[in-house]
Amino acid sequence: MSKMTVRTHEKRFPVAPDLYGLFFEDISRAGDGGLYPEMLRNRSFEDSLLPEGCVTKDGGRTFVSPTGWIDEFNNGEGMNQWVKDNRILPTPVPAWYSDRAEMELDHETVLNPHRRVSLKVHFSAGGSIRNIGFCGIPQETGKEYHFYMFARAGQEVPLTLTIEKNGQVYGSAEAKVRPGDWARYDAAFSAQGSADDAEFRISCAADVTVYFGFTSLMPAETFMGHGLRKDLAEKLRDINPAFMRFPGGCIVEGFSMETVWYFRNTVGPVWERPSHWLLWHYRASNGLGFHEYLQLCEDLGVTPLYVCNCGMTCQGRNPRYFNEEEQADMVGDILNALEYALGPADSEWGSLRAKMGHKAPFRLDYLEIGNENFGPEYEWRFNMIKKAVLERWPHLTIITNDRGRTCRLEADIADDHYYNMPEFFAEGITHYDSYDRQDADVFVGEFSVNQTYEGQLRAAVAEAMFMVGFERNQDKVRLASYAPLFQHIRYGSWFPNLIIYDNRRSFAIPTYYSWRLFGGNRGKNVVASEEEVPKIYYDIHGLPALSGDDGVRYRNPVWNGSPVLPSRGILAEAEVNGNEITVIRKTDPEMPAFPFKVYPLVTLGEDLECREGVFETDAWYEEGKDIALGILVSPKPLSYYDRTNPNPCDPWSMRFLEVSRWILSGGTSRVARDSFPPRDISEAKEVSLKANAFNHLKYTVSGHNVTLEVNGEIIDTVELPSYPAMGTAATDTDDTVILKIVNFSDQNEPVEINLDCDVETEYTVGLLTGKATDENSPDAPENVHDVLIQASGAGRFFAYDAPALSVSVLTLVKT
């Protein structure tokens, strides 16, 4: 039986008021065709335009950026998988098709200076063009839809507008294009039936040429009347968020100057906003822009957290660092964005906000400078932007991506990101317990299980274990958000995502419901609590390995009685000379510099399924050089992103390994885990090695322990990595005690609860539980969800039976 002791009279600190929030990034068609419910794909006809400086290859299937990063393109249709799975037929203008009409992009006759092309259509009599939307144009009986377009022609041209499928017309309207310059034409439709995959058609009875500069088809009913998809925004509201981070994410950085996110390109009339290619494999119209994000935050009652570009493209995609002029321009763009949000209505950018319908300033409390940026190039840019911003807006809370590598970065909050396996998050429950309280506060801005059990219940419970760690450390962990947030089910760039939808339906993965439980049951103060819980050991398996500093020599490696040879090098190559192996360090240009030592690694043999065994080798000890041996090394499963990345991905690269290493350094022996940063899992033990000679090293893995021997003497027995089977945290208010209990084991676990106050016998339990692989789908949207249970039997001392793989929130009423 586990045990939880709660001392409500010992208030540790107030809860962090903004702890649980949202992170929006336009990924997997989260914007156009998603939260921004534009129904016409490629509404400005620009999807097939290559970003400046990029060159197509593979017959147009991919392009290469100016710095060498590869993206899937397919003439603007995006990922190869989308084209295949969605059965996209070839067309010169993505999403648009013609029947008895000729289409071409016109680069000269454009609607305004921000539009790069128009669609020139020569209709034969009775010809038409049609748009297939985001795998169909959705229709729902009785619902209203609004259409508008900018068009021009040399003569009066009557056009028929229809929403149809296989000859069935769901709505129709007429538009008469007047001769002369560009003009806007509007129409309204009332759906005469329901469909998921209709098409929008523009037909012409005459033989004539028409130019189309911009088109749009949107539902009339939107969230609070502000233009966003209602069911998706309601799901955001119902998760009880306190803030929203936007607009990214990697799209803030882009992979070239053209693909960088600039505030100025996302405000004003939507037909005047330049589109731009996102590094998530498609072009965004920027209809969902800075104003719309701020308005959504206001409508949800959450505080905005704006992420600005710091002056570079994505460091994980062959970065380009802005020159002095470009950097100054970016600083100006950031200041203009802040003026748009916060400035008076008579300021330059505040006046545009007022013209957009919001005279009063928006609320904006947080500014994050950069996304996942680091190193010297980041540090000086961060300091430059921070100084400029705080001189004008001193109330802003400044968030950094990194704590500094060549110098300490002074910021209010530092943003940490984690993507990993379920066990990582269960073990991470204690990660912030030892966090330096003098360091910046913490924003866990992106985290999720994206390797094994993605989008399933076991992942949700593992993430909840991690969140228990946030609950316990709210004096330093101030903000947290899951990532990514949205995915159109037909356009996945990443998996998992919190909320998934097609054109008419939406559902949430199990994680959504654990967030709803945590975000809806906050309390007022974090109170003292202790727990006694069982542990679960990692299922460790793999190969022995040689490691240590560059040039360390080994000889005669033997695994389970048989000699073994080098099989692969990670940041290393093996130089073999007879029975000797020297570990030679290799540089990896894609490996960032870390403020800690990362040892090269040479694996031995091929049996990745081995879980126990004896490894022996001789190691030459040279003063000042570390010797290290890898214990059962194997790569983690690749995430969906890494499996589908057009840039080749080696599963044996260091970032996919979490190696346990026996390290002999400076006269001590210890075992450490490579978890970036490495952490010791054993106490350092003194050890004596013969200098300038070979020393015999041996480790034996048996059960949950590894025994270490040097020159025939056992020097230590170390317990292999484990994680707690359960995590608990407690908060209270004047009237209630709130207990969060997460059981990550596959067995029910009784919990003995000891309180220092009287409570009513009746209490409630918010519960999420099920089987490890349980998940939701469009046809079973709530196969996994939380329930509210009325329970009884509470008191100063009582027992709660935590179901296997469960998240429980107990609310007790004080008496």
Per-range role (PLM):
Residues 173, 672-698:
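Short, aromatic/His-centered strand-loop micro-motif at the edge of beta-sheets
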Residues 557, 617, 691-719:
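Carbohydrate-binding surfaces in secreted/extracellular proteins
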Residues 22, 53-118, 252-290, 317-332, ...:
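Aromatic- and acidic-residue-enriched carbohydrate-binding clefts of CAZyme catalytic domains
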Residues 106-127, 573-601:
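Short carbohydrate-recognition loop motifs
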Residues 296, 386-401, 413, 417-522, ...:
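Catalytic-core region of carbohydrate-active enzymes that cleave or remodel glycosidic bonds
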Residues 126-238:
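Extended acidic/polar, glycine-enriched regions
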Residues 547, 590-670:
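Secretory/extracellular carbohydrate-interaction modules
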Residues 724-759, 765-770, 808-811:
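Carbohydrate-binding surface patches
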